[in-house]
Curated annotation (Swiss-Prot):
It comes from Homo sapiens (Human). The gene is TMEM97. PANTHER family: SIGMA INTRACELLULAR RECEPTOR 2. The chain crosses the membrane at residues 10-30, 69-89, 100-120, 141-161. This is Sigma intracellular receptor 2. Changing E53Q: No effect on DTG binding.
Length: 176
């Protein structure tokens, strides 16, 4: 597979990632920060099922720091998702480079405390977490695996934007 074909495969992966992120953000993540009345009972039940089944303490009783990440997702990331979907599914949109770098770094930065919480928090002593919590290493790793794509795909995006010869920044020079 040549460089243009590889680039198109990565662009399609990224386009589908952003496309899939729209309903996940709207119907799951933002329930923690938007009024409950906005969501049909089916979506509320889906979130309850997920949070209980996977013992996700952040979505059962979201702490303030996690809600701040969700607010950023609402204000900054959600408007970017359709733009990024368009740019990557269309392909060859060099203008997406800078916004994609900003998105990827922001998202990876928010995932560090989330994944660290799942891996290292002593939930038996943590009074800020109510409801079911991961108790075993297997339950913690299961939660990490649910959130890991939101660290890995932005990392791929960042490397792609920084290393792809197609997306590399070229300084425009004035002709004399």
């Amino acid at each position: 597979m040549g460089a243009p074909a590889t680039r198109r495969c990565v662009e399609w992966l990224l386009g589908l990632y952003f496309l899939s992120h729209i309903p996940i953000t709207l119907f799951m993540d933002l329930q923690a920060v938007l009024p409950r009345e906005l969501y049909p009972v089916e979506f509320r039940n889906l979130l309850k099922w997920y949070a209980k089944e996977f013992k996700d303490p952040l979505l059962q009783e979201p702490p303030a720091w996690f809600k701040s990440f969700l607010f950023c997702e609402l204000v900054f990331q959600l408007p970017f998702f359709p733009i990024a979907t368009y740019a990557f599914l269309k392909g060859s949109c060099k203008w997406i480079r800078t916004p994609a770098i900003i998105y990827s770094v922001h998202t990876m930065t928010t995932l560090i405390p989330i994944l660290s919480t799942f891996l290292f928090e002593d939930f038996s002593k943590a009074s800020g977490f109510k409801g079911q919590r991961p108790e075993t290493l297997h339950e913690r790793l299961t939660l990490v695996s649910v959130y890991a794509p939101y660290l890995l795909i932005p990392f791929i995006l960042l490397i792609f934007m920084l290393r792809s010869p197609y997306y590399k920044y070229e300084e425009k020079r004035k002709k004399k």
